[in-house]
């Protein structure tokens, strides 16, 4: 701080400053990049650096997954993924695949689709009716039964099969996408 006190940032701007604030090496890297390319429109054209990064990302993905689509945020990523899922099924002649499945207490951003598949009750209530055709898997956190578990928990098989329950309920041929956080961030960390 200005008066010499040290403060621990326990929020870290929703995890976007996990390396700390104003780290000289990071500030210098950002400044150097901004001098070379501060913005490259992604529509029907790009910058060689964007293609280079896309190739590096694709090389990390499993075989056959070689397409990269850059977004500005997790919210935009979720919204784009949902649209890609719907468009994919329509292109395959499976236009009935419109149902989206999220998880209770899941957080998938601030956009309309992300809030719809997200399972944060307060967020969903604040906006009233959202996207139709969305259902949610039960959340796996059970504080009473998850206290300091070591190894495989003694419960949870019913949660592992929850997607099968929803498939039976809705008909799997109507499901376009399932989106879950492998580790709950906003509601579980």
Question: How does the language model describe each region?
Answer:
Residues 179-189:
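Conserved PLP phosphate-binding loop immediately N-terminal to the Schiff-base lysine helix
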Residues 56-177:
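PLP-dependent aspartate aminotransferase-fold enzymes
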Residues 36, 142-143, 184:
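Active-site/binding-pocket entry motifs
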Residues 1-5:
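Residue-level recognition of short loop/turn positions
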Residues 13, 74, 106, 183-185:
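Short glycine-rich anion-binding loops that position phosphate/pyrophosphate groups of nucleotides
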Residues 6-95, 101:
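Glycine-rich loop-to-alpha-helix module at the N-terminal edge of alpha/beta enzyme cores
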Residues 44-45, 150, 154, 188:
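Alpha-helix capping and helix-loop boundary segments enriched in small/acidic/polar residues
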């Amino acid at each position: 701080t200005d008066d010499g006190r040290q403060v621990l940032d326990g929020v870290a701007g929703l995890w976007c400053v996990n390396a700390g604030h104003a780290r000289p090496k990071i500030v210098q890297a950002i400044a150097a990049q901004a001098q070379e390319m501060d913005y490259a429109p992604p529509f029907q054209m790009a910058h060689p650096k964007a293609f280079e990064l896309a190739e590096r990302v694709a090389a990390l993905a499993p075989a056959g997954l070689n397409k990269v689509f850059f977004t500005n945020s997790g919210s935009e990523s979720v919204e784009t993924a949902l649209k890609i899922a719907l468009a994919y099924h329509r292109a395959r002649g499976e236009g009935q695949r419109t149902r989206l499945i999220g998880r209770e207490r899941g957080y998938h951003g601030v956009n309309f689709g992300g809030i719809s598949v997200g399972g944060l009750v307060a967020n969903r209530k604040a906006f009233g009716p959202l996207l139709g055709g969305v259902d949610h898997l039960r959340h796996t956190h059970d504080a009473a039964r998850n206290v300091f578990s070591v190894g495989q928990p003694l419960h949870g098989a019913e949660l592992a099969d929850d997607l099968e329950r929803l498939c039976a309920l809705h008909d799997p041929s109507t499901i376009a996408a399932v989106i879950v956080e492998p580790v709950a961030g906003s509601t579980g960390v």
